[in-house]
């Protein structure tokens, strides 16, 4: 049976002419390429091709005068001063000298960057020359330059009030009660001041529950939606506890190792992450929440020059963010000791196992000098926790609390999911039409399955005149960081990515995720669409579907239905047909997302929980949803219907949201 959208090829330009998408802002014409135009790595050695142009008029190339790699602190300080930090004074800036910067400011851990500014090793040295009696809970003098750099960017979102409708479930013995505001739990002057500087007004659901659990020194396994504020959920209570307790034996061990020529660092807290990008993002968040403290965060990851990372470590390290492979390397070189590690965090734990890091993780946690479970405080965070991961938690966690916050990866309120039938041969044309309709300030993330496909699609878009970039596993660390910075800054508002970017990347203002190639499993789909709609922002996820994606049909339908998304009838028909054919093989009829959660606590044999926090989702259903596709079955109303007919699965504007920024 051939499932062909019969009108897909008819008059795309004419169909879009009537969509009133503010065509003046969406013209594809432009002038010839300027000297400053970003050129993809695989095209840099080619002779310039005639006809390349920048879309200055449509916003594809940034018109900002500011250099893309300039400091975050370039904007004026219009926040107003924190009421928690009342001792600001201009004379304090002398404590922070200028840091040497790498080319990619905001990425962290490279060049001569020391994280918070270097200090001379004299009487004012901050990191390890202080005595044990120093009060780590008191804030150090401020630095206006550093404050502006750390806190000048970012958007905390506009949709936090809708988080109250997300269901939450906590299981385990004696679960601490959740909080409603950051002030409900004592975290100290430094943390509260930095929360205000970060402009966090209220905790997200995962923060409401995880912060008091961690503050009570309970081990935690948290299954939370992507973009839910997981990083702050563990950094805030860990850092506040370090400020309250001080360095303890770790500082003494570093002093014994040599005051000036120390070679080994003993971090108090260790955060493991699967990818370089996620590790750097966690590190950048740690820099914010350790501002004006004596805690110095560091980051180590593979794919970068190890000598510079060693030199950065030797300046002091209290909180270490690391990828497993590079951390094992540092431990074997004698640069890192885990003897006094009080806090262990495994972020994106399922992804680390998927990537084959289990031997390294067990080497770090079980076969070295790290304190055993019950002595250390351990937390596991992930977007999915299948039973295999939960069983692994038995080895790492002690009397833990299992926390499930919302159904993983998509919320009906924040991410609108659209699925359209597109034959392989038509995908590029469909993509161009989507990009032409996109607002000039919108960031678009396009996912493909292969590295070759990423390069090929970036090459195609580049020749079509779009300012785009790409990221995948074969790119050098420098090229990956440059691509991410070009995307974040808006100079290249289109990022073509493979799965390497699907996990953990926190780019807060991504408006649109496009699955140019759908993944083969639903978990990967969940993580991809989670790149938009992050931390309260509204997002749109569009997926190109055809016969190659039959295997994901049933799970995709289950997810769309549970998220209260509009479902095209052809997808329902395909799911029924595929499910019926596969039923003889024992395929389960229940949704893997049943109950609104991405995972369940395997310890609950009967479904009863020790404690539960829950609230119902918003009851209002999506508009539309009837008569999908009409008599054409899988064809729908052609690509014009992609925007305004039920053949696509609903009208983009049915939510009253202007997705295109016009």
From Swiss-Prot:
Give the signal peptide range: none
Question: Per the record, what are the reactions this protein catalyses?
Answer: ATP + H2O = ADP + phosphate + H(+)
Family under the similarity heading: Belongs to the DEAD box helicase family. DDX3/DED1 subfamily.
Q: Report residue spans for region: Interaction with IKBKE.
A: 100-110
UniProt note on tissues of expression? Expressed in ovary, including in germinal vesicle immature and metaphase II (MII) stage oocytes (at protein level). In the brain, expressed in the granule cells of the cerebellum and dentate gyrus, the pyramidal cells of the hippocampus, the ependymal cells lining the ventricles, choroid plexi and olfactory bulb. Also accumulates in the thalamic nuclei, the dorsal region of the colliculi and the pontine nucleus.
Q: Where is the composition biased (Low complexity)?
A: 604-622
EC number(s) of the enzyme? Answer: 3.6.4.13
Output the GO biological process annotations, alphabetical, semicolon-separated: cellular response to arsenic-containing substance; cellular response to osmotic stress; chromosome segregation; cytosolic ribosome assembly; extrinsic apoptotic signaling pathway via death domain receptors; inflammatory response; innate immune response; intracellular signal transduction
Determine the domain of life of the protein's source: Eukaryota
Which gene name does the record give? Ddx3x
Location of the region described as Involved in stimulation of ATPase activity by DNA and RNA, nucleic acid binding and unwinding in the Swiss-Prot/TrEMBL record:
250-259
Q: Where in the cell is it found?
A: Cell membrane; Nucleus; Cytoplasm; Cytoplasm, Stress granule
Note the InterPro entries from the entry.
DEAD/DEAH_box_helicase_dom, Helicase_ATP-bd, Helicase_C-like, P-loop_NTPase, RNA-helicase_DEAD-box_CS, RNA_helicase_DEAD_Q_motif
Major location category of this protein: membrane
Q: What is the official name of this protein in its record?
A: ATP-dependent RNA helicase DDX3X
